[in-house]
């Protein structure tokens, strides 16, 4: 992690702000599709601030600059930001949200500007109200992105990668029935159509996959679905011949990506009652999700012309069908085999001093081991390969010229995942190749107990991830410890590794989203000792119905089915802290791992010996 000088960039940006009578300028992380992970061409916030984390918002005034981010990135931001920037640690006591900070800077009649394609319509409305409540002038839409103007010719070009059709043997469902179900929802909500701008929703709905955003098999696009038509806005030259044929077969029209705003304006006008029809005529409305950009909402007619709803596509995508669930099981077995081979190899290299390996070299080896497995497409995010103090940086990103050497005396954390045609993986294991300290063993075991407790939880249908979160934190809480990140996130099926709407954590949003059978989530408690070590244990699990002796309130009861097939680190487990039930759970899990993965290592004595050692009964 490096600090980048931003003085010249900020000076140029402020000049552009003054020329447009803007006193405060907002630079979000997201792209025009509200993507969590973005293409390099959309990395505006990183360019202007120097902060490379995946979450955060930059706000620039004529004499100040602030970067707001969450607890996952406090250490990273503190390292990467130069002295032009104030770090707003979101969620910390007495620290304003970036919206509050922005409104405070606008006090006294000042004007706030933003690129309207990068802020959702709901965020824009809430921010306008906050700005005016503090005596600010207004939030205004600036069509020219000012950071792009500063970036100039050095800005990366927009990717235009091929788009492939995902066959039914992987997707489990064709587009036509997906569209039928969506139209049934729209009919119930009495809206004319639904405008979709979220990339993974479009990829899922049309059974297409791309690579416009690194690690995310999505492509730049929009879609409009009405009772009679489905239109995909995309660069048609990117579509494979098979994709073209599939879309035609499923009655999907294709329009240029750039036409969405012009077509939206035309569509919105066509839905307005004419003078002949009179004001009594029934107004037809379009629906958008709460992630739709302010710019697109304005093109569709703004308030009164559209209804903002919870995306029915997002909800449907989160409930995996049986084909997708079986794909998740199978890809995690193959992925587990790759990780087991990697950890056995890495321990042999490090503990026996066969080679000097840094964090990047180790991560490259892991990618190569994954790549040999069936249906491998690529990684699902940049591998977090972190040793010692680097492991305490929650979203650490190793770089070749500055990363650390892996040694046998420090904790090693590996958070990694892959994209397979039949599913998406995400696994974290923390290991030690020598003799860990008692503090490290205790911390690891407390995290492990939380991981197991949540995995073993049984709960009534309707329970949210917010309610389940304490299962994972309870043992750390008993010691006055905690971690600054969520406990779980939804996972896509050969889609984004972070997928809504579900999650497990303390965010208010999770209190309104019940977990349901077919959901796939991570379970990943952790503990981080700044400057020393970090521990995280992550499994992927599927929500399923379970049998219980009783069914209070006639509600089904739910539980988890874990699909990650990688053993925990025996050296780091303090058995004296485990209950008999926890030991039995570990034994059952280890037997399952051994049964599912040992077939990959018939001719690999090193890996097989490591696997048998790590899965011995407790």
Swiss-Prot record:
Record note on cofactor: Binds 2 manganese ions per subunit.
Q: What class of enzyme is it?
A: hydrolase
Query: What are its E.C. numbers?
Result: 3.4.11.9
Q: Write out the residues that bind Mn(2+) 1.
A: 426, 524, 538
The record's Gene Ontology biological-process terms are:
proteolysis
Q: Which residues form a coiled coil?
A: none
Protein keywords:
Aminopeptidase, Hydrolase, Manganese, Metal-binding, Metalloprotease, Protease
Q: Which Gene3D superfamilies match?
A: Creatinase/methionine aminopeptidase superfamily, Creatinase/prolidase N-terminal domain
Q: Which InterPro entries match?
A: Creatin/AminoP/Spt16_N, Creatinase/aminopeptidase-like, Creatinase_N, Pept_M24, Pept_M24B, Peptidase_M24_C, Peptidase_M24B_aminopep-P_CS, X-Pro_aminopeptidase_P
Required cofactor(s):
Mn(2+)
Binding site residues for Mn(2+) 2:
415, 426, 538
| Catalytic reaction(s) noted | Release of any N-terminal amino acid, including proline, that is linked to proline, even from a dipeptide or tripeptide
Alphabetized Pfam families for the sequence: Creatinase_N, Creatinase_N_2, Peptidase_M24, Peptidase_M24_C
Protein family membership: Belongs to the peptidase M24B family.
* Descriptive protein name: Probable Xaa-Pro aminopeptidase P
Q: Give the organism's phylogenetic lineage.
A: Eukaryota, Fungi, Dikarya, Ascomycota, Pezizomycotina
Quick one: which gene encodes this? AMPP
